[in-house]
From Swiss-Prot:
Keyword hit for Secreted: no
Residue numbers spanned by region Disordered: 1-29
Biased composition (Polar residues): 1-11
CDD domains tied to this protein: F-box_AtAFR-like
Organism of origin: Arabidopsis thaliana
Lineage top rank: taxon: Eukaryota
The protein's name: F-box/kelch-repeat protein At5g48980
UniProt keywords, alphabetically: Kelch repeat
Domain (F-box) ranges: 29-75
InterPro entries reported in the protein's UniProt record: F-box-like_dom_sf, F-box/kelch-repeat_ARATH, F-box_dom, Kelch-typ_b-propeller
Kelch repeats: 199-248
SMART domains: FBOX
């Protein structure tokens, strides 16, 4: 009898139950993953966010983890954050704008359109685009209008276009982790933009530069506003050394000039710069490492400060980048230290209902201290849009 029991145990039969039946019962009653939550969190944090859409389909628990603040904190601690380009477009006859993000096939070999002689096999591969603008489903309503979108980490702040209404309304911001709109506390008097080290600096009314309301400071961590003290403001061109230079859209109607602010965030110090006559190209410009880039009349222009002197020039190189039509809409954006260019291909007024948006990624290199060269890493057709669409903004978020 003892030998029979030992044989049954050795063969996996116990209490008359075959092992496969007990295994099936065990699987049916186990709903939790075998790995601890912290381990799953670390594993998912190391995965490119480009895969998150597909991973969210695995289970509700995965979907919950992929949108949790803990995941993005872990990605930051592990140094796994990525830059994602967000693009907002307005389509005709639609009340709310549409949001898109630049989707790039993970670990892809960059498409090289700059080489004139290519193999036939490579040409076939390039016919299917690996870069595209993928639509985003926003879970709640958009702000009606804004004059600027400010990117701070994984938040996109929508600054009001109406300075009269700005002090009386909260500041909406898009949480790029969950794609939901939230509201920051209302500001006192401010409506233009830039950000640095988690602090948003907003120049206010030009008519009263000595007012306490002239510059508002918003701390994104504490979600509080406060004015810059008068003694911390310096509106002199000679005081711009080692300060960050950026655009704004004030207009001095008397001189026909655009105004920009330069600031040093740690010391709450501001400076005022007079630019050329305000034009629409300023609205599509972007800042990369304290240098402003914009597109005007077929050229990519850069502008920055060399000590106390304002310097500028044309981006050299750019081999392979197609020429844009004079009627094309062009938008520039900073994307992980590189320049992203969005433009549309011109179509005649009649006979066409749609057009194509193209996108290029350009790496920048300073040479000889006075030149900036651009290398076109790739460009692709990324989205088909109605002919009368409008680009509202393009900016990168860190996730």
């Amino acid at each position: 009898m003892a030998d029979s029991q030992r044989l049954s145990t050795a063969s996996g039969v116990k209490d008359g139950q075959p092992p496969w039946k007990k295994k099936k019962l065990s699987n049916d009653t186990t709903s939790n993953p075998s790995l601890p939550y912290d381990v799953i969190l670390i594993i998912l944090a190391r995965v490119s966010r480009s895969y998150y859409t597909n991973l969210s389909l695995v289970s509700k628990s995965f979907r919950s983890i992929l949108t949790s603040p803990e995941l993005y904190k872990t990605r930051t601690l592990l140094g796994k954050t990525e830059n994602f380009l967000y693009v907002c477009l307005r389509f005709p006859d639609e009340a709310n704008p549409r949001w898109f993000t630049l989707y790039r096939k993970p670990n892809q070999t960059l498409t090289d359109h700059t080489t004139k002689k290519k193999k036939k096999k490579k040409k076939k591969e390039e016919k299917s685009s690996v870069n595209l603008l993928a639509p985003i489903s926003i879970l709640n309503s958009h702000p009606v209008e804004w004059s600027a979108i400010i990117s701070v980490d994984h938040y996109l702040y929508a600054i009001s276009a109406d300075i009269e209404k700005a002090p009386y309304s909260n500041v909406p911001y898009l949480d790029c982790r969950t794609h939901t709109w939230n509201e920051a506390p209302r500001m006192r008097l401010a409506h233009t933009n830039s950000e640095f080290e988690g602090i948003v600096y907003l120049p206010g009314s030009f008519e009263s530069p000595d007012s306490l309301n002239c510059v508002e400071v918003y701390n994104t961590m504490t979600q509080t506003w406060k004015p810059v003290p008068p003694e911390k403001r310096m509106f002199k061109l000679e005081n711009l050394e080692k300060k960050i230079y950026y655009k704004s859209f004030h207009l001095d109607s008397r001189a026909g000039k655009g105004l920009s602010l330069s600031y040093k965030s740690k010391h709450l110090t501001c400076g005022l710069v007079v630019l050329d006559t305000v034009d629409s190209y300023l609205r599509s410009s972007c800042m990369i490492e304290n240098i402003a880039y914009f597109y005007r009349k077929g050229n990519f222009i850069w502008r920055g400060l060399d000590g106390k002197i304002l310097v500028y020039g044309k981006i050299e190189g750019l081999e392979g980048l197609p020429k844009f039509s004079r009627y094309s809409s062009v938008q520039l954006a900073e994307y992980g230290g590189k320049l992203v260019v969005l433009w549309d291909k011109y179509v005649p007024a009649s006979g066409y209902k749609e057009k194509m948006i193209w996108c290029a990624e350009i790496s920048l290199e300073k040479r000889n201290g006075k030149e900036i060269w651009g290398n076109v890493e790739w460009f692709d057709a990324v989205l088909t849009v109605p002919k009368s669409y409008k680009i509202l903004c393009a900016t990168a978020a860190t996730l």
